[in-house]
Amino acid sequence: AGHSCGGAQVLANAKDPRIKTYLILNAGMGDMEMAGASPKSLKNLHAPILYLVGGKGDVAWPNAQKDYDAIKRVPVVLADNTQSGHDGTYRQEFGGDNSRMVSNWLDWLFKDVKEHDALFKQGDLKGYTGWTIKSKNFKE
Protein backbone atom coordinates (compact mmCIF):
# COMPACT_ATOMS: atom_id res chain seq x y z
CA ALA A 1 0.00 0.00 0.00
CA GLY A 2 1.14 3.51 -0.73
CA HIS A 3 -0.34 7.00 -0.49
CA SER A 4 0.56 9.76 -2.94
CA CYS A 5 4.21 9.27 -3.99
CA GLY A 6 4.11 6.01 -2.03
CA GLY A 7 1.81 4.64 -4.72
CA ALA A 8 4.71 4.85 -7.17
CA GLN A 9 6.86 2.91 -4.72
CA VAL A 10 4.22 0.18 -4.64
CA LEU A 11 4.23 -0.03 -8.42
CA ALA A 12 8.03 -0.04 -8.52
CA ASN A 13 7.84 -3.29 -6.54
CA ALA A 14 4.91 -4.79 -8.45
CA LYS A 15 6.89 -7.86 -9.56
CA ASP A 16 7.39 -9.11 -6.00
CA PRO A 17 5.65 -12.52 -5.87
CA ARG A 18 4.79 -12.07 -2.19
CA ILE A 19 2.29 -9.34 -3.04
CA LYS A 20 -1.32 -10.52 -2.84
CA THR A 21 -3.00 -7.15 -3.49
CA TYR A 22 -2.03 -3.59 -4.27
CA LEU A 23 -3.51 -0.48 -2.65
CA ILE A 24 -2.83 2.73 -4.54
CA LEU A 25 -4.18 5.55 -2.38
CA ASN A 26 -4.52 9.00 -3.92
CA ALA A 27 -1.88 8.07 -6.47
CA GLY A 28 -1.35 6.86 -10.02
CA MET A 29 1.42 6.77 -12.60
CA GLY A 30 -0.35 8.08 -15.67
CA ASP A 31 2.48 9.05 -18.01
CA MET A 32 5.05 9.89 -15.30
CA GLU A 33 8.17 8.21 -14.04
CA MET A 34 9.17 8.43 -10.38
CA ALA A 35 10.48 6.35 -7.49
CA GLY A 36 11.64 3.65 -9.89
CA ALA A 37 8.17 3.25 -11.43
CA SER A 38 6.69 4.18 -14.79
CA PRO A 39 3.59 3.25 -16.79
CA LYS A 40 5.48 0.10 -17.80
CA SER A 41 5.30 -1.02 -14.15
CA LEU A 42 1.60 -1.77 -14.66
CA LYS A 43 2.60 -4.76 -16.79
CA ASN A 44 4.18 -6.32 -13.67
CA LEU A 45 0.91 -6.43 -11.72
CA HIS A 46 -0.12 -9.96 -10.79
CA ALA A 47 -2.78 -9.47 -8.08
CA PRO A 48 -5.99 -7.45 -7.62
CA ILE A 49 -5.49 -3.71 -7.27
CA LEU A 50 -7.56 -0.99 -5.61
CA TYR A 51 -7.10 2.63 -6.60
CA LEU A 52 -8.68 5.10 -4.20
CA VAL A 53 -8.78 8.76 -5.22
CA GLY A 54 -10.38 11.98 -4.00
CA GLY A 55 -12.22 13.43 -6.97
CA LYS A 56 -11.05 15.90 -9.59
CA GLY A 57 -9.54 18.04 -6.81
CA ASP A 58 -7.06 15.23 -6.11
CA VAL A 59 -3.84 15.84 -8.03
CA ALA A 60 -3.59 12.06 -8.56
CA TRP A 61 -7.07 11.69 -10.08
CA PRO A 62 -6.10 11.89 -13.78
CA ASN A 63 -3.18 9.49 -13.38
CA ALA A 64 -5.31 6.95 -11.52
CA GLN A 65 -7.88 7.13 -14.34
CA LYS A 66 -5.14 6.49 -16.93
CA ASP A 67 -3.80 3.56 -14.93
CA TYR A 68 -7.28 2.04 -14.63
CA ASP A 69 -7.74 2.27 -18.39
CA ALA A 70 -4.29 0.75 -19.04
CA ILE A 71 -4.64 -2.28 -16.73
CA LYS A 72 -5.79 -5.26 -18.79
CA ARG A 73 -4.73 -8.44 -16.97
CA VAL A 74 -5.61 -8.20 -13.29
CA PRO A 75 -8.79 -7.24 -11.44
CA VAL A 76 -8.83 -3.50 -10.81
CA VAL A 77 -11.19 -1.24 -8.88
CA LEU A 78 -11.18 2.55 -9.03
CA ALA A 79 -13.05 4.01 -6.05
CA ASP A 80 -13.48 7.78 -6.09
CA ASN A 81 -14.47 9.68 -2.94
CA THR A 82 -15.36 12.61 -5.16
CA GLN A 83 -15.08 15.45 -2.62
CA SER A 84 -12.23 14.29 -0.37
CA GLY A 85 -9.25 15.69 -2.30
CA HIS A 86 -5.68 14.42 -2.17
CA ASP A 87 -5.62 14.03 1.63
CA GLY A 88 -8.67 11.77 1.56
CA THR A 89 -10.46 11.22 4.86
CA TYR A 90 -7.47 9.90 6.78
CA ARG A 91 -7.56 12.78 9.29
CA GLN A 92 -11.08 11.86 10.33
CA GLU A 93 -11.75 9.52 13.22
CA PHE A 94 -10.59 6.00 12.30
CA GLY A 95 -9.55 7.30 8.87
CA GLY A 96 -13.09 8.01 7.68
CA ASP A 97 -14.69 6.47 4.61
CA ASN A 98 -11.38 5.94 2.83
CA SER A 99 -10.14 3.66 5.59
CA ARG A 100 -13.48 1.86 5.64
CA MET A 101 -13.19 1.24 1.88
CA VAL A 102 -9.66 -0.17 2.32
CA SER A 103 -10.78 -2.34 5.24
CA ASN A 104 -13.70 -3.69 3.19
CA TRP A 105 -11.31 -4.47 0.32
CA LEU A 106 -8.96 -6.42 2.58
CA ASP A 107 -11.84 -8.27 4.27
CA TRP A 108 -13.29 -9.16 0.88
CA LEU A 109 -10.03 -10.46 -0.55
CA PHE A 110 -8.51 -12.17 2.46
CA LYS A 111 -11.47 -13.11 4.66
CA ASP A 112 -13.88 -13.86 1.80
CA VAL A 113 -16.54 -11.48 3.17
CA LYS A 114 -19.15 -12.04 0.45
CA GLU A 115 -21.24 -9.00 1.38
CA HIS A 116 -18.61 -6.84 -0.33
CA ASP A 117 -19.03 -8.59 -3.71
CA ALA A 118 -21.68 -6.04 -4.70
CA LEU A 119 -19.43 -3.14 -3.72
CA PHE A 120 -16.36 -4.19 -5.65
CA LYS A 121 -17.87 -6.10 -8.57
CA GLN A 122 -21.18 -4.31 -9.20
CA GLY A 123 -20.42 -0.85 -7.83
CA ASP A 124 -23.10 -0.95 -5.12
CA LEU A 125 -22.11 2.07 -3.02
CA LYS A 126 -24.71 1.62 -0.27
CA GLY A 127 -23.35 3.52 2.73
CA TYR A 128 -20.82 5.51 0.67
CA THR A 129 -22.31 8.94 -0.05
CA GLY A 130 -20.51 11.01 -2.68
CA TRP A 131 -18.53 8.12 -4.14
CA THR A 132 -18.25 6.57 -7.59
CA ILE A 133 -16.71 3.18 -8.26
CA LYS A 134 -15.91 1.07 -11.28
CA SER A 135 -14.23 -2.28 -11.76
CA LYS A 136 -13.07 -4.63 -14.49
CA ASN A 137 -11.19 -7.86 -15.20
CA PHE A 138 -12.95 -9.93 -12.53
CA LYS A 139 -13.84 -13.52 -13.38
CA GLU A 140 -17.51 -14.27 -12.82
Task: Walk through the language-model features, giving the residues of each.
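Conserved alpha/beta-hydrolase "nucleophile elbow" surrounding the catalytic nucleophile
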Residues: 1-4
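Short glycine-enriched nucleophile-adjacent loop
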Residues: 7-16
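Short, solvent-exposed loop/turn elements at domain surfaces
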Residues: 9, 87-89, 116
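The feature captures the conserved acid-bearing segment of alpha/beta-hydrolase catalytic domains
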Residues: 15, 20-92
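Alpha/beta-hydrolase-fold serine-hydrolase catalytic core, especially in secreted/extracellular enzymes
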Residues: 74, 83, 92-140
